[in-house]
Amino acid sequence: MFDVRCFPKSAAMLLAFHKPFGVVSQFTPDGSRHRTLADFGFPTRVYPIGRLDAESEGLLLLSDEADLNARLLHPARGHVRTYWAQVERVPAAEALAQLERGVKIGGRMTLPCSAWLLDPQPVMPPRVPPIRFRKNVPDAWIALELVEGKNHQVRKMTAAVGHPTLRLVRVKVGALELGDLAPGKWRGLSAAERASVFTR
């Protein structure tokens, strides 16, 4: 486990966590059956930067620095969030173009983004529990790069173009990557990774 004593007392603590499926992005129970961040041995003074819903997986950042939420997640900062979404059926070029132009969700258009079919298709760690496959319906992994992150936005976007999301993994926030960090594990960020946050 990462030794938090490596952080000088004056330095912000910044951690990367591979949030598994079925974990809520908070330390206190929410009344559901889901596990919380308290189950993973984090230092006592950190809190999540942004959120991933319980059904989503991947990179979740935690810190003891209060202003990092705005520094990392406000659209004006331009820190792109990259998601890999496993969707029903293989999207055609027009569906991907629709995602890039923006789709209407709840009466408003999403901001332009980048969307593409992953080639080759990634081999991801198994999800527990596994997703439900429809026997005669193919699936595919696509990537989306967004600078905004409304509630369930990626799932709503892919559903709006006819490709419901089966599994969603956030793989990158700005220059910070999930990499090969295993589900349920966390680590402190390197000096170079921290610089990519604090110098922007």
Show where each model-derived region lies.
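RNA pseudouridine synthases
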Residues: 2-200
